[in-house]
Amino acid sequence: MTAPDAGLPETNLRDTAARSTRRLAESRDVAPLLAELGLSAEEGLQPTAAVEAGELLHTAQQLRARGFMLLDVIGVDYSRYTAPRPQPFAVLYSVAHPRDHRRLFLRVWLSEGEAVDSLFPIWKAANYLEREVYDLLGIEFTGHPDLRKVLTPDDLEGHPLRKDFPLGETPTLFREGRFLDPAAFRAGLSGQQRGLTGYRGEMRRGERRREDIVPPLLPEGGPK
């Protein structure tokens, strides 16, 4: 099979590659975007801009209008970093443009106990992302429709990603009402009868016989 570009002169191939590289570099340059939005760049491995907490919603709206999508929300506790920081906490928002591949981090510096506006009204993807930051760092997002824990148990005290969270072993209490298995799965654990999962207790001991391998039993009417 002949390569599609086999008949092209080598100089043309080099020129085409150079133009493609230049266009890609230009498309990823966010300096003009920062100038349009009136943002100042901050040091970072990826293009990063500082945003005042009171300007976050307006900046996010401007980015959404330009076609940017929200990829991630990250909370950081800088309180014990050796280098001085403007505030002990920060929330970083990773946004990207799906067509020209520009990517930008917005960093909002926050003091202890300071809240920041939720971006859920602008990007629905902020829902679980902000809940995760709230759960692990305790940063609250004003205007979030359902700000509650999403990863840690409800009765866990503190926020695991804060620098003041105590290190060491935390006992896990498997008590009734905290980790509640479905009743059908519990029935399967006994080995006496199959639950809706098709699980049998013998398999738990490694006794996997051919007659034990059965398809899952579905609820009446099929999957729910």
Swiss-Prot record:
It catalyses: a quinone + NADH + 5 H(+)(in) = a quinol + NAD(+) + 4 H(+)(out). Residues 202-213 have a biased composition (Basic and acidic residues). One of its GO terms (cellular component) is plasma membrane. GO terms for molecular function: NADH dehydrogenase (ubiquinone) activity; NADH:ubiquinone reductase (non-electrogenic) activity; quinone binding. Pfam families: Complex1_30kDa. It is an enzyme of class 7 (translocase). Its EC number is 7.1.1.-. Residues 202-224 are annotated as: Disordered. Gene3D superfamilies: NADH:ubiquinone oxidoreductase, 30kDa subunit. Belongs to the complex I 30 kDa subunit family. NDH-1 shuttles electrons from NADH, via FMN and iron-sulfur (Fe-S) centers, to quinones in the respiratory chain. The immediate electron acceptor for the enzyme in this species is believed to be a menaquinone. Couples the redox reaction to proton translocation (for every two electrons transferred, four hydrogen ions are translocated across the cytoplasmic membrane), and thus conserves the redox energy in a proton gradient. NCBIfam families: NuoC_fam. NDH-1 is composed of 15 different subunits. Subunits NuoB, C, D, E, F, and G constitute the peripheral sector of the complex. This is NADH-quinone oxidoreductase subunit C. It comes from Deinococcus radiodurans (strain ATCC 13939 / DSM 20539 / JCM 16871 / CCUG 27074 / LMG 4051 / NBRC 15346 / NCIMB 9279 / VKM B-1422 / R1). The gene is nuoC.
